[in-house]
Amino acid sequence: IFYFMNFCLLTLYLFPGSLLGCFFYNDCKIQPQITRDLVISSNHFYVFFLISFVGFLTFFEDKKVKLLFIYLIFLSIALEALHIVIPERTYQWSDLFGNLFGVIVVIFFHYLNKKYEFFKK
């Protein structure tokens, strides 16, 4: 599931315009909004939280989890930076912070769980 989610994420992120907007609204310039944005982009937070959580469940060994979190942080920065050169897309700080915050929340809960063992194996 994690690899499929990565493929979907890359497809949605690198498509010039909004693939979901094309599907739902028949207009590739409209981006569907799940909830209202606050300081960060809520859509980006939800996506990166979900992919981080699924990744954590997929790779729960310590060495793999560390590599996973490095990968996800790099991915969240790289994908948003690519919006600078993709037509119909724009780089936005709120999107980048939404990406990073989604990953960081899962990292935080992972280390809390590791320290206090809420969920024993």
Annotated model-derived regions:
Residues 1-96, 100, 104-121:
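Bulky hydrophobic segments
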